[in-house]
From Swiss-Prot:
Family, as annotated: Belongs to the protein kinase superfamily. Ser/Thr protein kinase family.
Active-site residues, as the UniProt record annotates them: D637
Name listed for the protein in its UniProt record: Serine/threonine-protein kinase/endoribonuclease IRE2
Species: Homo sapiens
Effect listed in the UniProt record for changing K548A: Loss of autophosphorylation, of induction of apoptosis and of 28S rRNA cleavage, attenuation of repression of protein synthesis
GO biological process: apoptotic chromosome condensation; intrinsic apoptotic signaling pathway in response to endoplasmic reticulum stress; IRE1-mediated unfolded protein response; mRNA processing; negative regulation of DNA-templated transcription; protein phosphorylation; response to endoplasmic reticulum stress; rRNA catabolic process
Record's bilayer topology term: Single-pass type I membrane protein
Cystine crosslinks: none
Residue intervals on the Lumenal side: 35-430
Signal peptide bounds: 1-34
Length: 926
């Protein structure tokens, strides 16, 4: 039974609420109103709650708790639907002929009304409808009773709610295919002129509700309910009536609030949003937002401004591991052969694990799928398996037009899709809409996660379904310590499965589990991952290790990962592997024990960093990656959670090591790319754009690791920020190729050099990205001594060249920005005086600036004391004196001299695979 909870107005969320706080000044004044049903605005939210707000002030009066609007199964093994809690609309992920999200031409209530029905493939569908009435005290929100068929009672405030349940059965298999429950309040639309009611705006994915006076456009109040708003109701003539409301993207509300904040307003009086919106040069588009809450995924239509990234219509949302198809053979190792197909089926007993990053966010409105169903209700229309374009996605840019359309065009089209006539569809057939649509679901490429909050449990007999290969060995980043698997230099083979897991006889170690040479305490959990993977603190031959436990069904994956570990762990920056044991139910891998992940290194200021500075961390990261690439191994899942920090060695220093080889790919001899037949590998927000393209021009290469490493570089250098923004839209921003390197924009030497490297690594095209050796050779990693030596070598090389030589012209091109117009004006007076004693230097010449650096270095001991004090100690202080004043000098000089990369003098400054290998201009006779 629903229960009521009296509450006060929730604490406003920082961000949007602060943006809107100014809007409320001068508009809200405390007033006392008689709390009658007509004075209440009732708002339903995704979690099933019904909130009573004051129409005048927006104050929360009470909350009626109930079951969630949408509930799906937690044990689905093949498919699921995306449901819209606003009206019960259903969406699928495509069919054999169509790609991407597609809307079904019926809702859950309509499907229940049409049941029982059967699809053409023999699957039966049943539906059940259950009604209930709640009698609520409008003053306190307390439920008086639930009205049932047993008898009436004295009503006070009647609220009706209907529950629709749809189930799918396959007579050829005893398991239930799919089921869902949808609940909605009984509330017809409010009659009357739209202009007489207040207008309401809600934010998708959040609980913010904004109420506006439709006459003046004045913002009346805001309220944050903490959960996305699904419906707005008023009490009229002894019953609920539904009011129209518009849902906007969170970023759109941010955008509007920020634009409002830059407009000058009178010192007093309400803010007129009509005037405000008239100043905005933007357009609002209708999109489909895919979100996730505690019960699973859901969809909701939302307006966005043109600055919000959208997932394109028709984008194939492949699962992380890729489902098997009729044309694909699943091998023992987990590899797949053959060409992919959109006719998807999942292996028996597997869990359909979707790519969350490809779902969550704003999508272009998908087309409507039309198909056939046996014994369909006549009101559902008819048609063949064709699609029609989505509704017009444009919405007005000005606020008052938006308010009017919210009650006319948008209200009619969005809240009542079932009222559209069949003539509005293209290519309609004579009958039956449901069967082929749901059949297409059985054959379509559906990969939606049916996830629930994982409960921490450490039991020997696990209940989880086997891991999909793409999620193999992923350790949850929510764990306090991530000591996930890695590798070690070892020639050990997989141990015999005859060894049984058994407890020790020692009373002091009675909690330990022993499998062969590995022992661990099941209660000492270091981390856990998807599908039943756990990592424990343990022992291997007296050495402290991390013990990674996986299901025995993952034998092929374990073997492949161990083989890659054995091959690659002959490097200090690849985690060490010790051995593998097999018990009756699990595999156990003994791995090097680490003390932190890179995520903890960045985000935990109290963590002992073991003497590792950010530049050292990134250099060791790239050193390990270069080693993998030299072995033709592509990691394919670089992210902070998979980069670990070892404990201090005898000198008190830690190491950065790469871990989690579950998605690694060994490229065959003679090949430099890999296919995506087995799905899109990686993690949301850290994947290269070529992995997400529908029709990439070329197969992905090791450059995908460089892109991921570029994201990690910026994450470390910025102290935890991501170059593609908020996690909700991160992957969509990657697709659009729009990184934001705001933390590296400052015009100082270190950030100028870092910005150049990170920008190259994040190139939207793989070809311009540097290789791992090129990254390591970039000036970003040069010591001060190497920088100074480079300046000296360049100056010596150019000393006798004329100003017309190509190399000198290349150095002087764009030199005005390098020397800041005249470098004489930016050095200290004692140094200026000393330079004038011996020769003349042109203040506009980059070559003369390098000459001054070289000469003062050569004659450092002969310089006056005040000049030496200004320059600092050689090499660190000396070179920083010049790079601090001329932050572009090093990078500019390095680019200009690239044509001399093949010369022996410059080999230390350019990688062996540098793009310039032609003879250096002016190198004759050197």
């Amino acid at each position: 039974m629903a229960s009521a909870v009296r509450g006060s107005r929730p604490w406003p969320r920082l961000g949007l609420q602060l943006q809107f706080a100014a809007l409320l000044l001068g508009t809200l004044s405390p007033q006392v109103h008689t709390l009658r049903p007509e004075n209440l605005l009732l708002v339903s939210t995704l979690d099933g709650s019904l909130h009573a707000l004051s129409k005048q002030t927006g104050d929360l009066k009470w909350t009626l708790r109930d079951d969630p609007v949408i509930e799906g199964p937690m044990y689905v093994t093949e498919m699921a639907f995306l449901s819209d809690p606003a009206d019960g609309s259903l969406y699928i992920l495509g069919t054999q002929k169509q790609q991407g999200l597609m809307k079904l031409p019926f809702t859950i209530p309509e499907l229940v009304h049409a049941s029982p029905c059967r699809s053409s493939d023999g699957v039966f569908y049943t539906g059940r409808k259950q009604d209930a009435w709640f009698v609520v005290d409008p003053e306190s929100g307390e439920t008086q009773m639930t009205l049932t068929t047993e008898g009436p009672s004295t009503p006070r405030l009647y609220i009706g709610r209907t529950q629709y349940t749809v189930t799918m059965h396959d007579p050829r298999a005893p398991a239930l295919r799919w089921n869902t429950t949808y609940r909605r309040y009984s509330a017809p639309p409010m009659d009357g002129s739209p202009g007489k009611y207040m207008s309401h705006l809600a934010s998708c994915g959040m609980g913010l509700l904004l109420t506006v006076d439709p006459g003046s456009g004045t913002v009346l109040w805001t309220q944050d309910l903490g959960v996305p708003v699904m419906g707005v109701y008023t009490w009229h003539q002894d019953g609920l009536r539904q009011l129209p409301h518009l849902t906007l993207a969170r970023d759109t509300l941010h955008f509007l609030a920020l634009r409002w904040g830059h407009i000058r307003l009178p010192a007093s009086g309400p803010r007129d949003t009509a005037t405000l919106f008239s100043t905005l040069d933007t357009q609002l588009l209708m999109t489909l937002y895919v979100g996730k809450d505690e019960t699973g995924f859901y969809v909701s239509k939302a307006l966005v401004h043109t600055g919000v990234a959208l997932v394109p219509r028709g984008l194939t949302l492949a699962p992380a591991d890729g489902p098997t198809t009729d044309e694909v053979t699943l091998q023992v190792s987990g590899e797949r052969e053959g060409s992919p197909s959109t006719a998807v089926r999942y292996p028996s007993g597997s869990v359909a694990l979707p790519s969350q990053w490809l779902l969550i966010g704003h999508h272009e409105l998908p087309p409507v799928l039309h198909t056939t169903m046996l014994r369909v209700h006549p009101t559902l229309g008819s048609g063949t398996a064709e699609t029609r374009p989505p509704e017009n996605t444009q919405a007005p840019a000005f606020f008052l037009e938006l308010l009017s359309l919210s009650r006319e065009k948008l209200w009619d089209s969005e809240l009542h899709p079932e009222e559209k006539t069949p003539d509005s569809y293209l290519g309609l057939g004579p009958q039956d809409l449901l069967a082929a649509s749901l059949t297409a679901v059985l054959l379509g490429g559906w990969i939606l996660f049916v996830m629930r909050q994982q409960q921490p449990q450490v039991v020997e007999k696990q209940q989880e379904t086997p891991l999909a290969p793409a999620d193999f060995a992923h350790i949850s980043q929510d764990a306090q310590s991530l000591h996930s698997g890695a590798s070690r230099r070892s020639q050990k083979r997989l141990q015999s499965p005859s060894k049984q897991a058994q407890p020790l006889d020692d009373p002091e170690a009675e909690q330990l589990t022993v499998v062969g040479k590995i022992s661990f305490n099941p209660k000492d959990v270091l981390g856990r991952g998807a599908g039943g993977t756990f990592v424990f603190r343990g022992q291997f031959e007296g050495r402290a290790v991390a013990v990674k436990r996986l299901l025995r069904e993952c034998f092929g994956l374990v073997r492949r990962e161990v083989q890659l570990l054995q091959e690659s762990d002959r490097h200090p920056n690849v985690l060490r592997y010790f051995c593998t044991e097999r018990g009756p139910q699990f595999h156990y891998i003994a791995l090097e024990l680490c003390r932190a992940s890179l995520q903890e290194y960045v985000e935990n200021p109290d963590l002992d960093r073991g003497g590792l500075e950010p530049e050292v961390v990134l250099q060791q990261l790239m050193s390990g990656l270069a080693h993998l690439h030299s072995l033709h191994i592509v990691h394919r899942d670089l992210k902070p959670g998979n980069i670990l920090i070892t404990g201090p060695d005898s000198q008190g220093l830690g190491r950065v090591v790469l871990s989690d080889f579950g998605l690694c790919k060994k490229l065959p001899a003679g090949r430099c790319s890999f296919s995506l037949h087995s799905g899109i590998p990686g993690t949301e927000g850290w994947m290269a754009p070529e992995l997400l393209q529908l029709l990439p021009p070329d197969s992905p290469t090791s450059a995908v690791d460089i892109f991921s490493a570029g994201c990690v570089f910026y994450y470390v250098l910025s102290g935890g920020s991501h170059p593609f923004g908020d996690s909700l839209y991160r992957q969509a921003n990657i697709l659009t190729g729009a990184p934001c390197l705001a933390h590296l924009e400052e015009e100082v030497h270190d950030k100028v050099v870092a910005r150049d490297l990170v920008g190259a690594m994040l190139s939207p095209l793989p070809q311009p990205r540097p290789s791992a050796p090129q990254v390591l050779a970039h000036p970003f990693f040069w010591s001060r001594a190497k920088q100074l030596q480079f300046f000296q070598d360049v100056s010596d090389w150019l000393e006798k060249e004329s100003e017309q030589e190509p190399l000198v012209r290349a150095l002087e091109a764009g030199g005005c920005a390098v020397v800041r117009d005249n470098w004489h004006e930016h050095i200290s007076m004692p140094l200026q005086t000393d330079l004038r004693k011996f020769r003349s230097y042109k203040g506009t010449s980059v070559r003369d600036l390098l000459r001054a650096v070289r000469n003062k270095k050569h004659h450092y001991r002969e310089l006056p004391v005040e000049v030496r004090q200004a320059l600092g100690q050689v090499p660190d202080g000396f070179v920083q004196y010049f790079t601090n004043r001329f932050p572009r000098l090093l990078l500019h000089t390095h680019r200009a001299m690239r044509s001399c990369a093949s010369e022996s003098l410059f080999l230390p400054y350019y990688p062996p695979d540098s793009e310039a290998r032609r003879p250096c201009p002016g190198a004759t006779g050197r």
